[in-house]
């Protein structure tokens, strides 16, 4: 391949160092710039605290993203497209600029990092290569979080395991792979993965990565002419930074993340140290998932570039030195790189034949050497010219070494790593022992894979147990809190028990005092019992007097209840009549609530209140009657005006009808005159035709007479006479025709005018007819309304008369009730006076206690009377306010109902919007899931082949290659 460059079989890891500028917090803290850059052309050394470090390249803080990419990563693009594996990862402490170096700002041509630039470069190189090459590119994106591999393209895959393929190359089993055909597809995958990556805020970095991310680009290419297949993997790794808890202030989950990050980075450092030592036979790749994934990149088949990112601040001097030491050790690690070529059956066969021929030649040479060796062992001295020259043997055995070396480089390089690892053991171990050891290693690796699976299952089981333990701890914490609550409650109860004991003691003392007092009181009670017996005798006497008064009072109550019933019946009848009158006067309005059944059990105050309401209703009906009378007078006036307008309309209608009849007669006469003119026209036309016939006859006679010479003169005379007659006839005919035409034009003009007038009259007639019908309809409506008003007025007049009679009746009944009340009060006062006199005539009018009781009862009666009157007044006021309050309540209820309806509609609308939004979200998710499933998942994926020398190629069903894409070729991005 022309774009290939020569790469040695053994290649050192390339280490570049990049320093970021001081940030704001470091400048505010007063940190100094402790790094020094010696002035050399190559820019490959750095000095800190007097110690110099050498790297492949050192970038100062002002180095641009483009410069970093060109120096550190651009060369790997051609290696990957040539079939080699490549790895680029950034190493350093937290907030040292690793993510900025690897990703940067995607889409910004100045600030974008290595990953977007290398993606654009890969596609640009593909589009510029030979046309007969076809590429298939797929990408994976996952992170190592809390020492668990989590797929960033499918968040449901949270604990993936690492396995090895048939060539012992580690890979992440079950990771999502997406086929891509353009840089835009790759950027979409990157953005999707970035949105799922774990980040957090620490004291040193607002966007601190909490996991190691691995972005894998797998490029497979096929030469369509010779079916040669190459494959290359490019690992783009963004490591999480090492942290010091004292500086980052991590706690809780962030602290656990920091522990796992430091643990995996420590394992990475151990692997680098073991590889740099060169004498260790065991490399601890399996100590961490990170080193297990990067096994091929560290001492394996890959071209690796490490970007160590450092801080120049004195605050981070110790971490910077540690990072520089890591880079210096990594620079000594050697990788064995080879082309990942998939040979065809013919190629394997050809190589087999060559190796077979080579083996046969070598066997012949070995036999010669064995013969010579046997002669030497037999004591025979072999002459110099008979001795076999080893240099000639090697040259003869490998006549085409240069050609074969290029063809067998892949097979030899694939075994180079194993030869290096087994170099110290190959001298003492036989071939059979090596085979046994290889089988044993295979078995041990298989056991390790099984153990990985078991560890994965055990980790999941441990997660479940951890959740159960957390639940149990929560239950224990709740039980502990309840126990503490019960302890405090028990302490409180004990305190209450102690206080209760003290109270019991006090109560016992009080009981003793009460016992003493009881004896004293019992004596006093005996004395009082004697006094009570005497008072009981007096009470019996007073009770008899009270019973007599109670009997009389009951009789008075019966009379009063009888009077109340009579008053109630009268008011019931009165209110019923008032209700009927109100319905007659204002049937559409709400009348007073007259529930007669409710008046039966009411008292006098209720009757007075209802009577007050009746008087108010009567005054209201009077006002309504006056309003109705006024409206009736207005309606009568309007009816008179309407009758006048109707008569005027009828008069105008008669005149218009007369005009219409006149115009119709005139039109008939005009039509007759037109018919006469038409007849005259026809007569004149007939005369013209007859004259033309005579003229033709005369011409024929003239022609006949031309032969006769004798009649020539006569013919001339006749001809002259005939010409003169014809001229006269022609003139007369012309005059008549012109007169007839003028007359026809005048008649036609007159007819047009008559038609216009007739049309206007027809329109006016139709308008008048419509107005007449409308007036008639309004008159009918007014007449019906007037009849209704007259009937209503008559009913109201009758109701007014009935109301006047009812008012007289009510006044008489009220006067009667007033008189009865006066008589009842007088009788009651007389009876009370008699009782008072009788009581005073007894012994001193009773005891002092009874007098006090009577005065107390009288005061209570007066107070109750006042309260009752006040309640009656308040009740009347409330009855007046009740309609207004009911109206306001109805308005409020209507408003509440309207608001409830609006709220319900708003909730329904919100629910509909929410359902629609949820439906759209589910639909989008389903579409995205289907899109993702179309590109990944357990089912077969349709590859997106990319043909070199042009843009992305369209594909048919089943992944077959179609014609070239009409899309324009992607322009190279300035990297």
UniProtKB/Swiss-Prot annotation:
Alphabetically ordered keywords of this record: ATP-binding, Coiled coil, Cytoplasm, Cytoskeleton, Microtubule, Motor protein, Nucleotide-binding
SMART domains listed in its UniProt record: KISc
Region annotation (Globular) ranges: 932-975
Transmembrane regions: none
Record-linked InterPro entries: Kinesin-like_fam, Kinesin_motor_CS, Kinesin_motor_dom, Kinesin_motor_dom_sf, P-loop_NTPase
Disruption phenotype: Flies display impaired action potential propagation and neurotransmitter release at neuromuscular junctions, but are still capable of transporting certain membranes, including synaptic vesicles, to the nerve terminal.
GO molecular function annotations of the record: ATP binding; ATP hydrolysis activity; cytoskeletal motor activity; microtubule binding; microtubule motor activity; plus-end-directed microtubule motor activity; tropomyosin binding
Residues the record lists as binding ATP: 92-99
Record-linked CDD domains: Khc_CBD_cc, KISc_KHC_KIF5
Localisation per UniProt entry: Cytoplasm, Cytoskeleton
Residues annotated as domain Kinesin motor: 12-333
Oligomeric form and interacting partners: Oligomer composed of two heavy chains and two light chains.
Similarity comment: Belongs to the TRAFAC class myosin-kinesin ATPase superfamily. Kinesin family. Kinesin subfamily.
Entry domain remark: Composed of three structural domains: a large globular N-terminal domain which is responsible for the motor activity of kinesin (it hydrolyzes ATP and binds microtubule), a central alpha-helical coiled coil domain that mediates the heavy chain dimerization; and a small globular C-terminal domain which interacts with other proteins (such as the kinesin light chains), vesicles and membranous organelles.
Protein name from the UniProt record: Kinesin heavy chain
Organism, scientific name: Drosophila melanogaster (Fruit fly)
């Amino acid at each position: 391949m022309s774009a290939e460059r020569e790469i040695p079989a053994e290649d050192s890891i390339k280490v570049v160092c990049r320093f970021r500028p001081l940030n704001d917090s470091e400048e505010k803290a007063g940190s100094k710039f402790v790094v020094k850059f010696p002035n050399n052309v190559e820019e490959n050394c750095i000095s800190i605290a007097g110690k110099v470090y050498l790297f492949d390249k050192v970038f100062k803080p002002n180095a641009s993203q483009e410069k970093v990419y060109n120096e550190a990563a651009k060369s790997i693009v051609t290696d990957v497209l040539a079939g080699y594996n490549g790895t680029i990862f950034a190493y350093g402490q937290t907030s040292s600029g690793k993510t900025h170096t690897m990703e940067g700002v995607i889409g910004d041509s100045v600030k974008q990092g290595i990953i977007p630039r290398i993606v654009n470069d890969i596609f640009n190189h593909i589009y510029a290569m030979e046309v007969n090459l076809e590429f298939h590119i797929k990408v994976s994106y996952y992170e190592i979080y809390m020492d668990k591999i989590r797929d960033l393209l499918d968040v449901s895959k949270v604990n993936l395991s690492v396995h090895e393929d048939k060539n012992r190359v580690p890979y992440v089993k079950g990771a999502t792979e997406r086929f891509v055909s353009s840089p835009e597809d790759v950027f979409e995958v990157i953005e999707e993965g970035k949105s799922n990556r774990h980040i957090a805020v620490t004291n040193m970095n607002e966007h601190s990565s909490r996991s190691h991310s691995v972005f894998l680009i797998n490029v497979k290419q096929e030469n369509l002419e010779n079916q040669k297949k190459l494959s290359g993997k490019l690992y783009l790794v963004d490591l999480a930074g090492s942290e010091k808890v004292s500086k980052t202030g991590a706690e809780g989950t962030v602290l656990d993340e920091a522990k796992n990050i430091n643990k995996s980075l420590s394992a990475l450092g151990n692997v680098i140290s073991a590889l740099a030592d060169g004498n260790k036979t065991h490399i601890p790749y399996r100590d961490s998932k990170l080193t297990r994934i990067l096994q091929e990149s560290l001492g394996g088949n890959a071209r690796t570039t490490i970007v160590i990112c450092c801080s120049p601040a004195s605050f981070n001097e110790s971490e910077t030195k540690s990072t520089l030491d890591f880079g210096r050790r990594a620079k000594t690690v050697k990788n064995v790189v080879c082309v990942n070529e998939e040979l065809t059956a013919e190629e394997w066969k050809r190589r087999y034949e060559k190796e077979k021929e080579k083996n046969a030649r070598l066997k012949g040479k070995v036999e010669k050497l064995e013969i010579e060796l046997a002669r030497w062992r037999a004591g025979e001295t072999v002459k110099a010219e008979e001795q076999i020259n080893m240099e000639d043997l090697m040259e003869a055995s490998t006549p085409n070494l240069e050609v074969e070396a290029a063809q067998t480089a892949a097979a030899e390089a694939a075994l180079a790593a194993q030869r290096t690892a087994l170099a110290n053991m190959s001298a003492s171990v036989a071939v059979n022992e090596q085979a046994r050891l290889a089988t044993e290693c295979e078995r041990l690796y298989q056991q390790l894979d099984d153990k990985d699976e078991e560890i994965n299952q055990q980790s999941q089981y441990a997660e479940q147990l951890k959740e159960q333990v957390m639940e149990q701890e929560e239950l224990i914490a709740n039980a502990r809190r309840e126990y503490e609550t019960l302890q405090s409650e028990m302490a409180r109860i004990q305190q209450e028990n102690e206080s209760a004991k003290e109270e019991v003691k006090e109560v016992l003392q009080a009981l003793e005092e009460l016992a003493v007092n009881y004896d004293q009181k019992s004596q006093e009670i005996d004395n009082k019992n004697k006094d009570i017996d005497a008072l009981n005798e007096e009470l019996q006497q007073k009770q008899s007097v009270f019973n007599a008064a109670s009997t009389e009072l009951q009789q008075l109550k019966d009379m009063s209840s009888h009077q109340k019933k009579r008053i109630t019946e009268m008011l019931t009848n009165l209110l019923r009549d008032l209700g009927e009158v109100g319905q007659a006067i204002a049937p559409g309005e709400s009348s007073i609530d007259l529930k007669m059944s409710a008046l039966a059990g009411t008292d006098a105050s209720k009757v007075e209140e209802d009577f007050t309401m009746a008087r108010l209703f009567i005054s209201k009906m009077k006002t309504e009657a006056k309003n109705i009378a006024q409206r009736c007078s207005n309606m009568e006036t309007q009816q008179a005006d309407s009758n006048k307008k109707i008569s005027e309309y009828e008069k105008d209608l008669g005149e218009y009808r007369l005009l219409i009849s006149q115009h119709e007669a005139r039109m008939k006469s005009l039509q007759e005159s037109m018919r006469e003119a038409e007849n005259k026209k026809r007569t004149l036309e007939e005369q013209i035709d007859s004259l033309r016939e005579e003229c033709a006859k005369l011409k024929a006679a003239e022609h006949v007479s031309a032969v006769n010479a004798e009649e020539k003169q006569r013919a001339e005379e006749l001809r002259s006479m005939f010409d003169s007659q014809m001229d006269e006839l022609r003139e007369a005919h012309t005059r008549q025709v012109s007169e007839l035409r003028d007359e026809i034009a005048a008649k036609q003009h007159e007819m047009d005018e008559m038609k216009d007038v007739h049309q206007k009259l027809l329109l006016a007639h139709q308008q008048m007819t419509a107005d007449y019908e409308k007036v008639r309809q309004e008159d009918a409506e007014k007449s019906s309304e007037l009849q209704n008003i007259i009937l209503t007025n008559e009913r109201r007049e009758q109701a007014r008369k009935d109301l006047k009679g009812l008012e007289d009746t009510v006044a008489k009944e009220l006067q009667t009730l007033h008189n009865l009340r006066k008589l009842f009060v007088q009788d009651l006062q007389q009876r009370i006076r008699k009782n008072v006199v009788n009581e005073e005539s007894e012994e001193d009018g009773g005891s002092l206690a009874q007098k006090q009781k009577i005065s107390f009862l009288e005061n209570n009666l007066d107070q109750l009377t006042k309260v009752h009157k006040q309640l009656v007044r308040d009740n009347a006021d409330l009855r007046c306010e009740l309609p207004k309050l009911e109206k306001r309540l109805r308005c409020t209820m209507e408003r509440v109902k309207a608001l409830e309806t609006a709220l319900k509609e708003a909730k329904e609308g919100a629910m509909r919007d929410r359902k629609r939004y949820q439906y759209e979200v589910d639909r989008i998710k389903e579409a995205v899931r289907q899109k993702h499933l179309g590109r990944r998942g357990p089912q077969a994926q349709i590859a997106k082949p990319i043909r070199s020398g042009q843009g992305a190629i369209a594909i048919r069903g089943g992944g077959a290659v179609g014609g070239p894409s009409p899309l324009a070729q992607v322009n190279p991005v300035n990297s």
